[in-house]
Every structure is written in structure tokens, then in C-alpha cells.
Amino acid sequence: MSVWDERAEAYRQSREHSEGWDLELLVDWAGGARTALDVATGGGHVARRLREAGLEVVSSDPAPGMRADVVCPAEELPFADASFEVVTCRLAAHHFEDVKAATAEMARVASELLLIVDNLWISGKDEEANHLRDPSHVRNYSADEWRKLLPETGLDLEDDRVGERRIELEPWLERTRTTGADAERIRELVADRVEDGRLRIDRIALKGRKR
């Protein structure tokens, strides 16, 4: 059993993942499509919202415990080219070992749109905090890095939005069972972004259209 299998229920119940301006934006951007693939679906929140909007959705995730329709990594999607009108990936790219390969693979199986949401790189302190909380965190990327990456993977960047999200700090630590000295160090590292117990996270949503 992987660490993600152990965390699956916490992510299904997570308010951070089940709501937010970026989730609403993804659903809006996908409007009019009939089919979608949600990559690294996690708790399944994007897939659920797209199904509620009337799309036929397939979900994928590398962790069996996430209960996705297909178990596979983002870098190796077992689908033919242009299999889905829309491909989505929300709050997962910072875990990808090769984000460019994963983005190119998601673009390959999309016929029209690739929609990505992820947290933005803020500072070295922020990255240290993320690694302490979750060793599977590879890195966050800057807005400029994302804006450069999509055109390099066969997509025209049609739109992007940057905004912030404030989440409860302690549940964020509890979700990955981070306690003791690691939790204390994380609190120190992110102290300048915490107000009234809520952590500010900067986030980007990107809409890439297949060429």
C-alpha cells in the first residue's frame, strides 16, 4: 500500500480540494465538451463536478486507493491520441517527476483542451515546508514556467488566471499526518503567510488548446 492509498479518504473529505475558485473555473472552461479525462484525480472532486455538468468522465490516478477508473501515472496514459475532448489535472503536477513529459502526455490524449491547476512557486522556504510535509512533493513552478511549458508541449495558451486560496493550516498538516518537529518547522517556515490560522497559497489555472 502506498502513502497515497493511506491518505485517500482524507483527500476525498478535504474542503481544500472539494471547493475553490479554481475548481469552478475548470468546470466553466470545460463547458460544452462531452468527454473528459481527469488525471491524478485524487479525491475525485474535478471528475465529480464534471460529471454533474453532464460530461462523460474517465478518471486516472497512480494510487489504487484513490479509486480512479484507471490506475496509471500521468506520464504514461493508456489512451489513444485525442481520446478526450478535455483533459484536466488539478493540484497534482507538483508531484510529477517529469512535469514536461506528463504535460505532453496529457496534451497527446486531448483533442481540444488541457486544463491545469496547481500551486505556484513562492520561495525556497515554501518548498522546504512542502517537502517536510510531503516527501512526494517534487516542486512547485512559477507562473512564467507554466506559461512557457504549455507551448512547448503542443498547446496554445488560451487563458490563465492567478489567484490565492486560504486554507486551514492545521488540517493541512493533519492530512499528511505531519506532527512533531516537522510540523513545528513547517509552522516557522510559513509563518509570514499565515493569518488567523489560515495559510495563503498562490495558485494558477491554465487553459491550453491543442494546435
Question: Where are each of the predicted segments found?
Answer:
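A short glycine-rich, Lys/Arg-flanked "PGG" loop and its adjoining helix->strand segment in the class I
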Residues: 100-114
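Conserved class I S-adenosyl-L-methionine
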Residues: 1-32, 45-49, 170-174
